[in-house]
């Protein structure tokens, strides 16, 4: 059977292209760190924006970790929000100085699809880089939730998100 040189070139080209695509896919990291600055007087914004993502992540076999400052998540809210109660873990009463360290350790394990932590202070460049590396290593998402009072919104980001405090008990 006769095949032209053109056919050989195109098949070797597609083979090379598939190798490049495979290598670039293997090198692509899927981790993400995002900071959500929210106003305390706009409770529905966080629910509208974050809940669909958290619901989708809840379909994975991995856990969702919530590192909350003081409040405890309400079972009723978790269930009503469409989040999988059996995959949501919470650690509360965590001091801010331990939140970043705990997030890094949790993200790095790969056991969590998402790790959510509350911080009032800005991250240092080093902390942010450490979180990004951990999220990439664990193929996970991390959300830094940063509350801002309504009066201070003029000096900060104008749009914001919030998981409302009445969702806790």
Swiss-Prot record:
Domain of life where this protein originates: Bacteria
Residues the UniProt record annotates as site (Essential for degradation by Lon protease): 169
Tagged with keyword Cell cycle: yes
Pfam entry (one): SulA
Coiled-coil ranges from the UniProt annotation: none
Classification via SUPFAM superfamilies: P-loop containing nucleoside triphosphate hydrolases (SSF52540)
Post-translational modification: Is rapidly cleaved and degraded by the Lon protease once DNA damage is repaired.
One example of a Gene Ontology biological process annotation: SOS response
Keywords, ordered alphabetically: Cell cycle, Cell division, DNA damage, Septation, SOS response
Region (FtsZ binding): 106-112
Alphabetical list of InterPro entries matching this protein: Cell_div_suppressor_SulA, P-loop_NTPase, SulA_CellDiv_inhibitor, SulA_enterobact
Region described as Lon protease binding: 162-169
Induction: By DNA damage, as part of the SOS response.
Function comment: Component of the SOS system and an inhibitor of cell division. Accumulation of SulA causes rapid cessation of cell division and the appearance of long, non-septate filaments. In the presence of GTP, binds a polymerization-competent form of FtsZ in a 1:1 ratio, thus inhibiting FtsZ polymerization and therefore preventing it from participating in the assembly of the Z ring. This mechanism prevents the premature segregation of damaged DNA to daughter cells during cell division.
Annotated family: Belongs to the SulA family.
Entry protein name: Cell division inhibitor SulA
Species the sequence originates in: Shigella flexneri
Gene name as annotated: sulA
């Amino acid at each position: 059977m006769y095949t032209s040189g053109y056919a050989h070139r195109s098949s070797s080209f597609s083979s090379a292209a598939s190798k490049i695509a495979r290598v670039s896919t293997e090198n692509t990291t899927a981790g993400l760190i995002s900071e959500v600055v929210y106003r305390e007087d706009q409770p529905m914004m966080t629910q509208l924006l974050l809940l669909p993502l958290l619901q989708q992540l809840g379909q994975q076999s991995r856990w969702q970790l919530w590192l909350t400052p003081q409040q405890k998540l309400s079972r009723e809210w978790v269930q009503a929000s469409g989040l999988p109660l059996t995959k949501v873990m919470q650690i509360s009463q965590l001091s801010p100085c331990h939140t970043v360290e705990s997030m890094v350790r949790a993200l790095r394990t790969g056991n969590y699809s998402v790790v959510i932590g509350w911080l009032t202070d800005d991250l240092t460049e080093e902390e942010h880089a450490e979180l990004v590396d951990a999220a990439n290593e664990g193929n996970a998402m991390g959300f830094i939730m940063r509350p801002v009072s309504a009066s201070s919104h003029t000096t900060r980001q104008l749009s914001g998100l919030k998981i409302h405090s009445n969702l806790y008990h």
